[in-house]
Swiss-Prot record:
Keyword Cytoplasm: yes
InterPro entries for the chain: GalP_uridyl_Trfase_II, GalP_uridyl_Trfase_II_CS, GalP_Utransf_C, GalP_Utransf_N
Cellular compartments per GO CC: cytoplasm
Keyword annotations from UniProtKB, A to Z: Carbohydrate metabolism, Cytoplasm, Galactose metabolism, Nucleotidyltransferase, Transferase
Protein name per its UniProtKB record: Galactose-1-phosphate uridylyltransferase
Gene: galT
Length: 486
């Protein structure tokens, strides 16, 4: 079979708008993209390997330049043919939803993988391992999936005119956007529309997923993130609509928020994070909300879990906690709601359905900085920044580390150092490596497992740094004082 005929088969299989009668038409569409010389190009049974063959042929035929951006743009165009139109996708999704939410999400997830919108091969490169801690097994990932920028594309982008369209990577405007040297190709991207709080929202999957069925729920309007009572209402509405998914929001302040504060969105998916498994340590009373169970979660960060079968009462209780926290100051533990009139408090909320009940975890956040901690008082401190210095966002709050790609090679050099072998270990790891060398015996047989455990301990410390009420006696007494204010 040729690459062209194989891809025609993929298109007909995935896109109900085409049948085998369209084979000649589709063949000509493909030749227009990759060049007539590719007509007899030998194919591969694997659709993604077959895709690679066509992209390579297009480059050899002079249809695209030799750059990463050009290859990705063509990949998306070739897979766009295999993807139903946005209106058709939405019709099919909501038709399938009638048979059950899981039926619809399973179908949309499978399509988003099959059409290469979800970059399954890139995601497979990520390093993932568990790490035992006093808080349960944390999840450690070294993120290798996002491709490094091609120097040719960087140079081209520097000279390109800035259109400002799409406004950002989360906008509805990205659906079907061809892409350019400085903006990802999204021709094969599709978004499910739904109403949330009386407004149009979109539901899509993340192309570089950090966990199973990593979903993004986004406001149709490009407006900044905000955490208020409507946030809690929206999150509970989403888990009612998609009960097999959790959903949460990044905080709405710098340092403690995510990397995208300019567009209102939430993240969710079908994954049980370590924080969801963590038990309640201490029960808490929420004034005026007797039907809401509340408690402090055994977790390195400061988390209050609210549980109720009544979503309205849960929303009101969560808003009460948020409002008290947003005004709460305790100088004895460096917790300050305002400094010079500037607000520093917010929450990272996470919602789940557990049987007939709703769960809402509120993670207390404070984004102050100081001379001692210029990156953030409640942010990874300097001595752990050799492993993690970026913001602690929603996913990491829940116990899944998203560590930078540099660590794959850097930790390999640390291992060589610990084994007494020749190495090029970065100086920033030396203090930590010396502590590990003094404390443990290192052999070629145990070095990888012990290194993973050590990284897990550092990540637990990172989360403790981000916790506003520390796990020591002083911090826990301060947490109890805050809870009494509720």
């Amino acid at each position: 079979m040729t690459a062209i005929s194989n891809h025609v088969g993929t298109i007909v299989k995935l896109n109900p708008d085409y049948t085998q009668m369209d084979a000649v038409y589709l063949t000509n569409k493909l030749l227009n993209l990759i060049g007539d010389a590719a007509l007899d190009l030998p194919g591969d049974a694997d659709p993604l390997t077959n895709l690679d063959l066509m992209v390579k042929a297009a480059q050899e035929n002079g249809k695209i330049p030799d750059s990463q951006a050009a290859r990705q743009i063509l990949e998306a165009q070739l897979m766009d043919l295999a993807t139903p139109t946005p209106s058709r996708i939405n019709q099919l999704f909501w038709d399938k939803y009638q048979a059950g939410p899981r039926v619809a999400t399973d179908w949309f997830f499978a399509l988003s993988r099959a059409n290469n919108y979800i970059q399954t091969r890139a995601i497979a490169k990520n390093v993932v391992f568990p790490a035992k801690t006093e808080y349960g097994d944390l999840e450690i990932t070294i993120n290798l999936s996002k491709p490094e920028k091609d120097p040719k594309d960087i140079a081209a982008a520097a000279h390109a005119a800035q259109s400002g369209y799409p406004a950002c990577a989360l906008c509805l405007q990205t659906e079907g956007y061809a892409g350019r040297t400085d903006f990802a190709a999204r021709t094969n991207h599709r978004i499910i529309r739904f109403l949330l709080g009386g407004k149009t929202w979109g539901f899509q999957y993340s192309p570089y997923a950090y966990f199973n069925e990593h979903a993004i729920f986004l406001d149709a309007i490009h407006e900044p993130m905000v955490i208020d009572q409507s946030t809690f209402s929206n999150l509970l509405s989403i888990v009612s609509m998609f009960p097999t998914y959790f959903v949460g929001s990044n905080a709405d302040l710098p340092i403690v928020g995510g990397s995208m504060l300019t567009h209102e969105h939430y993240q969710g998916g079908r994954h049980t994070f370590p924080m969801a498994k963590a038990p309640i340590e201490t029960q808490v009373e929420i004034s005026g909300h007797p039907h809401v169970f509340a408690g402090i979660v055994k977790w390195p960060m400061s988390v209050i879990r609210l549980v109720s079968a009544d979503s309205d009462e849960l929303i009101n209780a969560a808003e009460h906690v948020r409002q008290v926290w947003n005004q709460y100051t305790d100088e004895t533990v460096d917790v300050r709601a305002f400094v010079d009139g500037k607000p520093h408090h917010t929450v990272t909320p996470i919602a789940r359905r557990v049987g007939s009940e709703f769960q809402l975890d509120l993670v207390l956040r404070d984004n102050q900085t100081s001379a001692e901690h210029p990156d953030g008082i409640f942010h990874p401190h300097q001595d752990v920044q050799h492993i993690k210095k970026e913001n602690i966002g929603l996913i990491e709050v829940m116990g899944r580390a998203i560590l930078p790609a540099r660590l794959k090679s850097e930790l390999a050099e640390v291992q060589k150092y610990l084994l007494g072998e020749a190495n090029t270990m970065k100086p920033m790891h030396k203090t930590w490596a010396d502590q590990l060398k003094a404390k443990y015996d290192w052999t070629p047989e145990n070095v990888e497992a012990q290194m993973q455990a050590a990284v897990g301990r550092v990540f637990a410390r990172v989360l403790e740094d981000a916790g506003v009420f520390k796990r020591d006696e002083v911090g826990q007494k301060a947490f109890a004082r805050f809870c009494r204010a509720l």
